[in-house]
UniProtKB/Swiss-Prot annotation:
Positions occupied by motif AHA: 314-323
Annotated SUPFAM superfamilies: Winged helix' DNA-binding domain (SSF46785)
Protein name: Heat stress transcription factor A-2e
Origin organism lineage: Eukaryota, Viridiplantae, Streptophyta, Embryophyta, Tracheophyta
Segments of this protein annotated with the region Hydrophobic repeat HR-A/B: 158-208
Organism encoding this protein: Oryza sativa subsp. japonica (Rice)
Record's note on what induces expression: By heat stress.
């Protein structure tokens, strides 16, 4: 029986394989290189699609992409490419592949291997292996990853603003306390001024009801000027010296000169400033020796009353108002009011100006 070979096997001559040489087989070049992950490929196609530029597109530098409308991105594009609509999950996936957020105020992400027109570089992007951790830690880590994309910067900015506001509040409180203390001091001064004004008006009201006293007070001005001119020409003599003869040939003792020595002041100023005046001098001229004796007796009785450095305190005004310094119901209103007012204000200076014996 003859057998013919229908399909002969062609034996090719060539280099011996590794099996013949006893070496293990190796894969062909390029078979081991896998493509980029589907997540990166879909993301690249979604960003590179010009029809979705209103929602997501490349940045001006072409090395990052920007999600312009996160709401439409999650509701329209994510279900079309990834079968879900969770934008936070998409951000976490980007974080696992090493994407970083460029601008904290925008949803802009970048990676060294994610460039426009260079899709072959996606193979260089590797997924980071998550560390072994419990599920609770993994969920917490996902929130922290999302926080890296802008929330930490916002939190730091809010903290700085809070510190600035607290410092401003403390400063305003200090200014408020200072202003409050100043207002209290001003109120106290105002109350004191009002009290002095009330005392002054009450005193003036009583004085104006006694016209005789006012007339006598102003009638002394001419007499005062003459006495001041006379006293200015005189010189004080010591006690041990003898009496000096004046131009009329009469002698005058130091006691007589001391009775007319006084401080030159206006009658009205003396009334309100408490400066001792010479009402007793006018009384001597008007009433003679009897008035001089009355002045001497009244000065001896009230010798302890002294003016308080030319100032009228509140006690003086109260004593004057309560004790009736100017009483129109007395027997002789003009003389009595003038004497009592002189005693209160320390106008009688005959006893204080006498030379020591």
């Amino acid at each position: 029986m003859n057998y013919r070979v229908v399909n002969p096997v062609k034996v090719e001559s060539g280099p011996s394989t590794g099996v013949a040489n006893g070496q293990p087989p190796r894969p062909m070049d390029g078979l081991a290189d896998g493509g980029p992950p589907p997540f990166l490929t879909k993301t690249y196609d979604m960003v590179d699609d010009p029809t979705t530029d209103a929602v997501v597109s490349w940045s001006a530098t072409n090395n990052s992409f920007v999600v312009w409308d996160p709401h439409l991105f999650g509701n329209v594009l994510l279900p079309r490419y990834f079968k879900h609509n969770n934008f936070s999950s998409f951000v976490r996936q980007l974080n696992t592949y090493g994407f970083r957020k460029v601008d904290p105020d925008k949803w802009e992400f970048a990676n060294e291997g994610f460039l426009r027109g260079q899709k072959h570089l996606l193979k260089s992007i590797k997924r980071r292996k998550p560390p072994n951790s419990s599920p609770s830690q993994q969920s917490l880590g996902s929130f922290l990853e999302v926080g890296h994309f802008g929330y930490e910067g916002e939190i730091d900015q809010l903290k700085r603003d809070k510190h600035l506001l607290m410092a401003e509040v403390v400063k305003l409180r200090q200014e408020q306390q200072n202003t409050k203390s100043d207002l209290q001091a001003m109120e106290q001064k105002l109350q004191g001024t009002e009290q002095k004004q009330q005392h002054m008006m009450a005193f003036l009201s009583r004085v104006m009801h006694n016209p005789e006293f006012i007339r006598q007070l102003f009638s002394q001005s001419e007499m005062r000027k003459e006495l001041e001119e006379f006293v200015s020409k005189k010189r004080r003599r010591r006690i041990d010296q003898g009496p000096e003869l004046d131009s009329m040939g009469t002698g005058s003792s130091p006691e007589q000169v001391s009775q007319v020595m006084f401080e030159p002041h206006d009658p009205v100023d003396s009334l309100f400033n408490g400066v001792p005046s010479d009402l007793e001098s006018s009384s001597v001229e008007a009433n003679g020796g009897k008035a001089q004796q009355d002045v001497a007796s009244s000065s001896s009785e009230h010798g302890k009353i002294k003016p308080s450095n030319g100032e009228l305190n509140e006690d003086f005004w109260e004593d004057l108002l309560h004790e009736g310094g100017l009483d129109e119901d007395t027997r002789n209103p003009a003389i009595d009011d003038m004497n009592l007012l002189s005693q209160k204000m320390g106008y009688l200076n005959s006893s204080s100006t006498k030379s020591p014996q």
